[in-house]
Amino acid sequence: MSDEVRLRDVEETDLEVFFEQEQDPEATRRSQFPPRDRERFMTHWTTKVLGDPTVLVQTVTVNGTPAGNVVSWWEEDRRFLGYWFGRPFWGRGIGTRAVTLFLQREQTRPLYADPYTGNTGSVRLLERCGFTRAGTVWYGDNEHILLVLHA
């Protein structure tokens, strides 16, 4: 039996799940995204994600259990896509299915993503969803691949 992957609006209780997922050392190593303390995390989510009407964010559930989130936001004149999944949901095709569902809701094109170069699983996920490599960007000492999804 395959996993049932669905998207739904974020509920307040999901934030605790997302916070715990961000604290996973392997996830932060792969993403090169440092974990935030609880107060900074919750403030970011309540003001910059849930509090911003231009942000589209969905909780990803697997068989009814929150597995992570997919989000899109504006950075200047570019719309970006990002996601975060708990480790138990890695390597099962869940991310690809979730992003595919999300892309049916997020209609802005071009749409950009910039995973850390060393996060090969994330790069492959985006390429499976139709993103193509457009260059590299640097955040401090970390090289990221800029990918774009065209119309």
Regions found by a protein language model. Give the residues of each.
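Short loop/turn motifs at secondary-structure junctions and domain boundaries
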Residues: 48-53
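Acyl-donor (CoA/ACP) binding surface of acyl/acetyltransferases
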Residues: 1-26, 30, 57-151
